[in-house]
Amino acid sequence: MPPKKADDGPKQHPIIGRFGTSLKIGIVGLPNIGKSTFFNVLTKSQAAAENFPFCTINPNESRVPVPDDRFEFLCEHHKPASKVPAFLNVVDIAGLVKGASAGQGLGNAFLSHISACDGIFHLMRAFDDDDIIHVEGNVNPVRDIEIIREELRLKDEEMIIAALDKLEKVAVRGGDKKLKPEYDIMCKVKTWVIDEKNHVRYYHDWNDKEIDVLNKYLFLTSKPMIYLINLSEKDYIRKKNKWLIKIKEWVDKNDPGALVIPFSGVLELNLQDMSDEEKQKYLEEKMTQSVLSKIIKTGYAALQLEYFFTAGPDEVRAWTIKKGTKAPQAAGKIHTDFEKGFIMAEVMKFDDFKEEGTEASVKAAGKYRQQGRNYTVEDGDIIFFKFNTPQQSKKK
């Protein structure tokens, strides 16, 4: 039975954020809340984790493998010579303080580090420890969220005012009709962010033209945010802490739809020093589990990233692409010749491959697809690209 041809996918709408796949997610929060400890555990690196503000001056950056059972299955099946998973780029950014947008602490430098990131792990402290000072004097994660929220908004306010001043001179007083639509959109952004004191991402109905303008400026408050609550090991295991409900209520009211993930930096740090067997035994005894994999996967998805697989005895590899990527551009991730000479993508769904067991069986079951240049690649697709070169037709 010949492979089936499928219809081209629907038109994709633009996404707020930087286009590309080398995207970063930054760990943001006040000083002394466990950011560097979390970064060390997440990346298994040894960034300084001292007990004083601003111990992280230059942002530490690391690549973290994205856990995926599908990748592990393909590696076990093919037993390849090379295994390359997808990676999440994580940046540990020094603690912000109240007044950072006005230059307090090392505020301007830190805010520029956030600007270079594409998403935010907003870390907050919900544990008491007399040995670890809190920059605000006491533990109150809801207050801490408000501080970070306002500092990011104030920095965007500066950018919006400066942009509008420039646009008004050219588009309004100068009569440049080409820039008038951008001026009108920025006026709407000003109303939302400055007058109504919201974050850009709180508004979910920006149209395509508005998103194009937002992506020109890449405001801090447009970046996707995941809220991470750092608990004591005791509170995390028993799933009880007086701040959990208060934080969830704040997020539901102010940033609806955003994810809130409780974790314990101390627990994760302790688990890191254990063997796999000791770790499993400890977690079973405590009737709890690590959430690091969940945090990594959530951060990767928040950047609007996904991946397809190429798989065989030589290599199993996850290729990172932006959601909505068409087949020729996905092929170009492997080699520019694949995109230039693209003929088709031969696609298997992972679940079909796992169920049928072999490529031949997938074909025999009529589940093997030939896709054209308008096909939108889906997360977990297993793809073989056919392409032309000046010499001959090739296949990977």
UniProtKB/Swiss-Prot annotation:
Gene Ontology cellular-component annotations: cytoplasm; nucleolus
Domain TGS: 304-387
Main subcellular localisation: cytoplasm
Location of the motif Nuclear export signal: 267-274
Swiss-Prot/TrEMBL cofactor(s): Mg(2+)
Binding-site positions, ATP: 32-37, 231
Domain OBG-type G: 23-283
Superkingdom classification of source: Eukaryota
Binding sites annotated in the UniProt record for Mg(2+): 36, 56
Keyword list, A-Z: ATP-binding, Cytoplasm, Hydrolase, Magnesium, Metal-binding, Nucleotide-binding, Nucleus
Location relative to the cell: Cytoplasm; Nucleus; Nucleus, Nucleolus
Gene Ontology MF, one: ATP binding
Similarity remark: Belongs to the TRAFAC class OBG-HflX-like GTPase superfamily. OBG GTPase family. YchF/OLA1 subfamily.
Known function: Hydrolyzes ATP, and can also hydrolyze GTP with lower efficiency. Has lower affinity for GTP.
Assembly mode: Monomer.
Protein name per Swiss-Prot or TrEMBL: Obg-like ATPase 1
Record lineage: Eukaryota, Metazoa, Chordata, Craniata, Vertebrata
